[in-house]
Amino acid sequence: MLSRLFAPKVTVSAHCDLPCGVYDPAQARIEAESVKAVQEKMAGNDDPHFQTRATVIKEQRAELAKHHVSVLWSDYFKPPHFEKYPELHQLVNDTLKALSAAKGSKDPATGQKALDYIAQIDKIFWETKKA
């Protein structure tokens, strides 16, 4: 009796963990822009409390950017994309490494490098959306 009460009524499945069409590299770009902006602000303020707060925010935003790039790589891009863009695996890896470097640095050049990589992913992403 109890087993029927708690048994699933409907079984569903999906090919992804998000509804289709939600993916967009803009999410990663916005977070990476925040990282670079914080790095620039850190250069102009020596207050130790500000530096601590800025470091926490910068690290959080870098992790969010890494998350969004990882979701694109693992959930959006499919084998046909990797066949058409064989550089995509390395590009994602380089982007994640650049975001890690920006996370651990006050130098806005590291934030810009991450943004440059994200721009390359963005270009490929929108090309795949046209197909």
UniProtKB/Swiss-Prot annotation:
<dbReference type="GO" id="GO:0016151">
    <property type="term" value="F:nickel cation binding"/>
</dbReference>
<keyword id="KW-0533">Nickel</keyword>
<dbReference type="GO" id="GO:0005737">
    <property type="term" value="C:cytoplasm"/>
</dbReference>
<protein>
    <recommendedName>
        <fullName>Superoxide dismutase [Ni]</fullName>
        <ecNumber>1.15.1.1</ecNumber>
    </recommendedName>
</protein>
<dbReference type="InterPro" id="IPR014123">
    <property type="entry name" value="Superoxide_dismutase_Ni-type"/>
</dbReference>
<keyword id="KW-0479">Metal-binding</keyword>
<feature type="binding site">
    <location>
        <position position="16"/>
    </location>
    <ligand>
        <name>Ni(2+)</name>
    </ligand>
</feature>
<dbReference type="Pfam" id="PF09055">
    <property type="entry name" value="Sod_Ni"/>
</dbReference>
<keyword id="KW-0560">Oxidoreductase</keyword>
<comment type="similarity">
    <text>Belongs to the nickel superoxide dismutase family.</text>
</comment>
<keyword id="KW-0049">Antioxidant</keyword>
<dbReference type="InterPro" id="IPR036502">
    <property type="entry name" value="NiSOD_sf"/>
</dbReference>
<keyword id="KW-0963">Cytoplasm</keyword>
<feature type="propeptide">
    <location>
        <begin position="1"/>
        <end position="14"/>
    </location>
</feature>
<dbReference type="GO" id="GO:0004784">
    <property type="term" value="F:superoxide dismutase activity"/>
</dbReference>
<feature type="binding site">
    <location>
        <position position="20"/>
    </location>
    <ligand>
        <name>Ni(2+)</name>
    </ligand>
</feature>
<feature type="binding site">
    <location>
        <position position="15"/>
    </location>
    <ligand>
        <name>Ni(2+)</name>
    </ligand>
</feature>
<comment type="subunit">
    <text>Homohexamer. The hexameric protein has a roughly the shape of a hollow sphere with an outer diameter of 60 angstroms and a large interior cavity.</text>
</comment>
